Amino acid sequence: MAVQQNKPTRSKRGMRRSHDALTTSTVSVDKASGETHLRHHITADGFYRGRKVIAK
């Protein structure tokens, strides 16, 4: 089992955790339906960039 030789400093701990922050998702509003969706994804109604791409 691996055991550390020395206690990691607060600085090293902070540097390791610097990439752990969560970011908010970027959402867009569809031109045709006004529905919000993730960028580069279709809406739940099947619209993408103002056009109907999936017929339901």
Curated annotation (Swiss-Prot):
One of its GO terms (cellular component) is large ribosomal subunit. Signal peptide: none annotated. GO terms for biological process: translation. Keywords: Ribonucleoprotein, Ribosomal protein. The gene is rpmF. It comes from the Bacteria. Belongs to the bacterial ribosomal protein bL32 family. Residues 1-34 are annotated as: Disordered. The keyword Ribonucleoprotein applies. GO terms for molecular function: structural constituent of ribosome. This is Large ribosomal subunit protein bL32.
